[in-house]
Amino acid sequence: MGKLRPGRVEWLASGHTERPHLFQNLLLFLWALLNCGLGVSAQGPGEWTPWVSWTRCSSSCGRGVSVRSRRCLRLPGEEPCWGDSHEYRLCQLPDCPPGAVPFRDLQCALYNGRPVLGTQKTYQWVPFHGAPNQCDLNCLAEGHAFYHSFGRVLDGTACSPGAQGVCVAGRCLSAGCDGLLGSGALEDRCGRCGGANDSCLFVQRVFRDAGAFAGYWNVTLIPEGARHIRVEHRSRNHLALMGGDGRYVLNGHWVVSPPGTYEAAGTHVVYTRDTGPQETLQAAGPTSHDLLLQVLLQEPNPGIEFEFWLPRERYSPFQARVQALGWPLRQPQPRGVEPQPPAAPAVTPAQTPTLAPDPCPPCPDTRGRAHRLLHYCGSDFVFQARVLGHHHQAQETRYEVRIQLVYKNRSPLRAREYVWAPGHCPCPMLAPHRDYLMAVQRLVSPDGTQDQLLLPHAGYARPWSPAEDSRIRLTARRCPG
């Protein structure tokens, strides 16, 4: 740790010894000297210097590790800087040539012929993978029944043969989707690293339409770009899959394919068929072109469940193509509601007096950042939605909404949902045919039969505007944890 003490300024650093730019150091020094000279007390954390450049990969072939560092500048009385002083990323180089000595083997071999264990005896060492700590250099003495630990392995060594993790500073770390080791970053359902499932839509439907005769029936188009595809049914019928070139991938031409993994549209399709009537298709995606899902009908269709995630910009073309082809695809139904036949027009007797409802009392004022932050951070879902209509049911108001944009979700949302609000005079009152930003909670009954989205009384629901959109995006960054 090096220290620079001109005029009560302290330079704290750890690890690497690269020097930041001289001009930048001079500015930081003058700023600190001015603050100290004026008697300004230092508070809060210190300031990080910019990251230095990434080092070269620790390996010349295969996988290795690259590192970059930064330093914390702080005055007396300031807290340490928040965050890490070092970042490690995985670097992937061309595969090592056949016959190359593995990295761990090479490290053990460095101790061949050298006296160890306080004696003059020497041994030939090979890696030993049965020790508890994978990131220690545990080497077995050839021809003997013992191993010895020579400390930590070098950074970039594989934790174990075939493992995805690599050792860094004695710890086994895996790379997140951002390439940084130990970051824990994951792809969301849309394929975005660290995303919030807000750049795609979840399509989930049940296909029940089919004729009475045996043969192939169209179920759905699985469009290009679809991810996390799952299809399932329970019957003696068989799922069939056709590529964009008109050739069958699975169960075509009245021939049932064996269970297994098939290549289709740039992804692996896993086809399983139990000894019972259940049959499933699963694919991670994304698909590189359209696929046509069909069913080879042999008995009445009890229902085929299918789901996938689709980029938002592809959803409208998908709907248009399905409707243009005349395929009987049902629209997404709101959560927890079975499809109902259209209601017959209500007949109102002539001269029936209509009683005006009692006026609703004014709603409490819910403006302000604190209210927005409270409901955003404590909600299960935050989205932009258009109110299609509302209905009073028992002591609740039910809004039917169409989801436009999702800011936060803890489980998939459908294109259309029902949002419930307590009372016949909910606060806030939502007007039909308007777009709102709203924060709602998910309520599931203990037996799982009821699954509702609840807009609490005096909760967060405000007309959508560009300004409110900016405020809610800023609020998302301020939630704890």
UniProtKB/Swiss-Prot annotation:
Residues 345-355 have a biased composition (Low complexity). SMART domains: C345C (SM00643), TSP1 (SM00209). One of its GO terms (molecular function) is microfibril binding. It comes from the Eukaryota. Keywords: Disulfide bond, Extracellular matrix, Glycoprotein, Heparin-binding, Secreted, Signal. It is found in: Secreted; Secreted, Extracellular space, Extracellular matrix. Residues 45-97 form the TSP type-1 domain. Disulfide bonds join 57-91, 61-96, 72-81, 360-425, 363-427, 377-479. Its main location: secreted. GO terms for cellular component: extracellular matrix; extracellular region; microfibril. One of its GO terms (biological process) is extracellular matrix organization. Residues 360-479 form the NTR domain. Gene3D superfamilies: 2.40.50.120, 2.60.120.830, Thrombospondin type-1 (TSP1) repeat. Proteolytically cleaved to release a C-terminal fragment containing the NTR domain. Residues 1-42 form the signal peptide. InterPro entries: ADAMTS/ADAMTS-like (IPR013273), ADAMTS_ADAMTS-like (IPR050439), ADAMTS_CR_3 (IPR045371), ADAMTS_spacer1 (IPR010294), Netrin_domain (IPR001134), Netrin_module_non-TIMP (IPR018933), TIMP-like_OB-fold (IPR008993), TSP1_rpt (IPR000884). Glycans are attached at residue 218. Residues 331-361 are annotated as: Disordered. Interacts with heparin, FBN1 and FBN2. May play a role in modulation of fibrillin microfibrils in the extracellular matrix (ECM). This is ADAMTS-like protein 5. The lineage of its organism: Eukaryota, Metazoa, Chordata, Craniata, Vertebrata.
